[in-house]
From Swiss-Prot:
The chain crosses the membrane at residues 27-47, 83-103, 129-149, 191-211, 219-239. InterPro entries: ATP_syn_F0_a_bact/chloroplast (IPR045082), ATP_synth_F0_asu (IPR000568), ATP_synth_F0_asu_AS (IPR023011), F0_ATP_A_sf (IPR035908). It comes from Mycobacterium ulcerans (strain Agy99). Key component of the proton channel; it plays a direct role in the translocation of protons across the membrane. It is a multi-pass membrane protein. This is ATP synthase subunit a. It is found in: Cell membrane. F-type ATPases have 2 components, CF(1) - the catalytic core - and CF(0) - the membrane proton channel. CF(1) has five subunits: alpha(3), beta(3), gamma(1), delta(1), epsilon(1). CF(0) has three main subunits: a(1), b(2) and c(9-12). The alpha and beta chains form an alternating ring which encloses part of the gamma chain. CF(1) is attached to CF(0) by a central stalk formed by the gamma and epsilon chains, while a peripheral stalk is formed by the delta and b chains. Its main location: membrane.
Length: 250
């Protein structure tokens, strides 16, 4: 009986909604996404000013320079900077955007709703399946557009289905359809699981809740960074596969 009461108090996967232009939107996800986007833009202008200045690089600049160097190495080894220089800024932007979206939920910003329950104001956007699907579909469209640009409007779908062995064309088609699904569900599953754990910790008595909450929030920073890096890394890999030519093997 007690377990049933506690389970009923856990609210995970529920979102505050509103109707905009005859469409129902999750306002908490929109808020987190908008704040993350503004932070990314602010960081871009800040780092741009630091790069063009003669001052000693600070910690923030060195952190993002390290990320850019790491991503540049991945793009160079997978595709080649001369072939697809546009993949590097795209991968870095996706990484930073997802990273900030994930890390926003770590901030101790809470409020009490009309039912008297304490709720996080900034929920992780990646815990909303709509957010991760939109990101994955954006990447899906971008790397196929790059593949058409590199291989041609006829050559790209032929190479896509044929792969390295023509007889595996049906499997290659299923694999291609599964890419955005797996890319989105990987990110969603990890972040959503974190939301469930936070909801469980919230049921602890206040005098001991701070300890597991602090431990999990620290680990959540690590999980958010790893998942953002994996998403960006797979983005580079998918661009590499979509832009590969036959002569690249010779």
């Amino acid at each position: 009986m007690t377990a049933s009461i506690l389970a009923a108090q856990i609210e995970v996967g529920e979102h505050h909604t509103a109707t905009w232009l005859c469409m129902t939107v999750n306002t908490d996800t929109v808020l987190s996404t908008a704040i993350a986007a503004l932070i990314v833009l602010a960081l871009a202008f800040y780092l741009r000013s630091k790069v063009t200045s003669t001052a000693v690089p600070g910690g923030v600049q060195l952190f993002f320079e390290a990320i850019t160097i790491q991503m540049r190495g991945q793009v160079e080894s997978a595709i080649g900077m001369r072939i697809a220089p546009f993949v590097l800024p795209l991968a870095v932007t996706i990484f930073v955007f997802i990273l900030i979206s994930n890390w926003l939920s770590v901030l101790p910003v809470q409020y009490t709703d009309e039912h008297g329950q304490t709720t996080e104001l900034l929920k992780p956007a990646a815990a909303d399946i709509n957010y991760v699907l939109a990101l994955a579909l954006f990447v899906f469209v971008c790397y196929h557009a790059a593949g058409i640009w590199r291989r041609g409007i006829v050559g790209h779908p032929i190479k896509l289905l044929k792969g390295h062995v023509a007889i595996l064309a049906p499997i290659n088609l299923v694999e291609e359809i599964a890419k955005p699904i797996s890319l989105s569900l990987r990110l969603f599953g990890n972040i959503f699981a974190g939301s469930i754990l936070v909801a469980l910790i919230a049921l602890f008595p206040p005098y001991i809740m701070w300890a597991p909450n602090a431990i999990w929030k620290s680990f959540d920073l690590f999980v958010g960074a790893i998942q953002a890096f994996i998403f960006a890394l797979l983005t580079i890999l998918y661009f590499s596969q979509a832009m590969e030519l036959e002569e690249d093997h010779h």
